[in-house]
Amino acid sequence: MATFIPVDEFDLVIFGGTGDLALRKLLPALYHRVSDGQITGGSRIIAASRRDVARDDYLATVEDALRRYLPDGEFRDEQWADMRDRIYYAQCDAQTPDQWHALVDLLQGTEDRVRVAYLATAPALFGPIAQGLAANGLVTGNSRIVLEKPLGRDYESACEINN
């Protein structure tokens, strides 16, 4: 039997939170981490996307995705209730960082915890998102960025993203 060690409280911001990668892969994986007791306390999962979606509507979308993409019999109402309480939604267009008010408000007061920005977006948005995080004061000593592969179309575009 595997042993799972709970992690410290964190905020995970998934840019591209309404996309296929988030709904099909990331959120089911996070559901497993919640179910195994690895994500505890006040840890939050914040989906960020340019779409104007109410939180309840986003939660319904996530529940539907979990029921669809988890293996048969793995979805449990109790684990979903725990995960649902951790999920937030912020409308946030990567191209207009001066309009990230919803995300800034959600992250205000949590500067001491680990803050992970998961960029489940097109590589062309990696730079604007990183710049938007900095411009909005969302980068702390505990901040991390996770980039979804591939990085660019070729060597030159990968170097451009990396710089």
Q: Where is each model-derived feature located?
A:
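Rossmann-fold NAD(P)-binding glycine/threonine-rich loop
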Residues: 95-98, 102, 115, 123-145, ...
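A structured beta-alpha segment of the ubiquitous adenosine-cofactor-binding alpha/beta core
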Residues: 69-114, 138
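Glycine-rich phosphate-binding loop and adjoining beta1-alpha1-beta2 segment
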Residues: 35-88
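Short, well-ordered amphipathic alpha-helices
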Residues: 25-34, 62-71, 103-105, 129-134, ...
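N-terminal low-complexity, Ser/Thr- and acidic-residue-enriched intrinsically disordered segments
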Residues: 1-57, 104-105
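Structural motif
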Residues: 11, 114-116
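Gly/serine-rich nucleotide phosphate-binding loop at the start of the catalytic core
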Residues: 120
